[in-house]
A protein has these predicted regions:
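Radical SAM/AdoMet-radical enzyme domain recognition
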Residues: 14-34, 41-183
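Short, P/G- and charge-enriched loop/turn segments at secondary-structure junctions
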Residues: 245-249
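Canonical Radical SAM [4Fe-4S] cluster-binding loop centered on the CxxxCxxC motif
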Residues: 1-12, 271-275
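Generic secondary-structure boundary/loop-capping signal
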Residues: 179, 251, 276-279
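Short, small/polar residue-rich loop motifs at catalytic or cofactor-binding pockets
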Residues: 253-257
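Proline-centered helix-kink/hinge sites
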Residues: 38-40, 270
Length: 296
C-alpha cells in the first residue's frame, strides 16, 4: 500500500489537488476521499485540512479507509469528527471503514482496524460507518457482522438505537475481465445470509449506497417481510414493503446524480464500474457542479 502511494501516477499530487482540483470542487455538496488508501498519502493531513477550510457549510465530506492509517492521520480524523472540527464548521463529516475478512488481513492489522473504529465511535457515534464488500457466497459475512456488532455493544449502543453497515456487491467493471465479482446467480444466497443476520442482530441495518438488486430477497419467507424495513438503498431510502411491490411503481436501479469519480490525473468518471470509460478531465471545467456532471 505504501508502494502504491509513492508510485507516480497512482496518487494525486498535492499541488495538483490544491491548484486544480480543490478550486473546482469546493462548492460541491459532497466530497469523498477514496483510494487505494487515502490516509497513507504523504500529504493526507494537508489535503483533508485544506478541503475542510474551503468547503461550504452544510456540505458532506467522507473518507473511505481500510483503517490501517498512521497515528497522525488518526489524530486528525479524531479532531475532525468531534464538535471542535467539522461540526463547528457545519460540515457533515463521516468515515467509511471497510471491514476485511481474516483471509485478507493479518491479526495485527485487524486489531489496528478495531482500535481505529472504537476511537472514532467513542468521539462521535455518528462519525463512522462500517462497510462490507460482498464478493462471494462463501465469505465470512456472519463473522464480519458479529465483529462489528461486538464493537457497538462494547461501546454501549443503547438498545433502542440501530446502526447501519454499508454493503457493496462486487459488480463487474466495464472493460476489465480481471476483477473479482459476485455472480448474479449468487445474489439470493448472499441475501439469505443477510436476512439471517438481520434476525440475529436486531439493531443491525444494511445500506446499499446505490441500486438494490431485488433478487437478493428471492429466498425470503413471508414471516420475514418486516425485516426488509431495515434494508436501505440509494443511501438512506428504505426498501419498500414487499407486499406493495406488485401494485407500486418502483425504481431500484442506479441513483440519480451519483458522485463523479476523479482519478489522480484529474480524469473523470461517473461511477466505479465504469472507471475505464473516461468522460473528461476536471481541468475542462471552471467548476464541478450538478450542471457539469450532467454535461459529462
Amino acid at each position: 500500500m505504501e508502494e502504491t502511494v509513492n508510485t507516480p501516477g497512482k496518487s494525486m499530487d498535492f499541488e495538483f489537488f490544491k491548484e486544480d482540483v480543490l478550486p473546482r470542487v469546493k462548492t460541491a455538496s459532497l466530497i469523498n476521499f477514496m483510494g487505494g488508501e487515502p490516509t497513507l498519502h504523504p500529504r493526507f493531513n494537508d489535503i483533508l485540512s485544506s478541503a475542510l477550510d474551503n468547503m461550504q457549510p452544510f456540505s458532506f465530506l467522507g473518507i473511505f479507509t481500510n483503517g490501517l492509517m498512521p497515528d497522525k492521520a488518526l489524530e486528525l480524523l479524531l479532531n475532525t469528527v468531534g464538535k471542535d472540527g467539522s461540526i463547528q464548521k457545519q460540515i457533515q463529516f463521516s468515515v467509511l471503514l471497510n471491514w476485511q475478512t481474516m483471509e485478507n488481513i493479518s491479526v495485527k492489522n485487524h486489531e489496528r482496524c478495531r482500535e481505529v473504529a472504537k476511537a472514532l465511535l467513542r468521539k462521535n457515534g455518528h462519525g463512522l460507518m462500517f462497510s462490507l464488500n460482498l464478493y462471494s457466497k462463501e465469505q465470512e459475512l456472519a463473522t464480519q457482522c458479529a465483529e462489528i456488532n461486538e464493537i457497538y455493544q462494547d461501546l454501549g449502543l443503547p438498545k433502542n438505537q440501530k446502526y447501519k453497515i454499508r454493503v457493496s456487491p462486487a459488480f463487474p467493471i466495464v472493460g476489465d475481465q480481471e476483477n473479482i465479482t459476485l455472480p448474479i446467480r449468487d445474489y439470493p444466497k448472499v441475501g439469505r445470509m443477510m436476512i439471517d443476520l438481520l434476525k440475529e442482530y436486531p439493531q443491525l441495518c444494511f445500506r446499499f449506497d446505490c441500486s438494490f438488486p431485488p433478487c437478493f430477497l428471492d429466498e425470503i419467507q413471508e414471516d420475514e417481510y418486516p425485516l426488509v424495513e431495515r434494508i436501505f438503498y440509494h443511501g438512506n431510502q428504505p426498501v419498500p414493503n414487499i407486499q406493495d411491490w406488485e401494485t407500486s411503481d418502483l425504481y431500484l436501479g442506479c441513483a440519480d446524480d451519483s458522485p463523479m469519480d476523479i482519478d489522480p490525473q484529474g480524469d473523470c468518471f461517473n461511477c466505479f464500474p465504469f472507471h475505464n470509460l473516461k468522460l473528461g478531465n476536471i481541468t475542462d471545467f471552471k467548476q464541478i457542479n450538478d450542471l457539469s456532471i450532467k454535461k459529462m
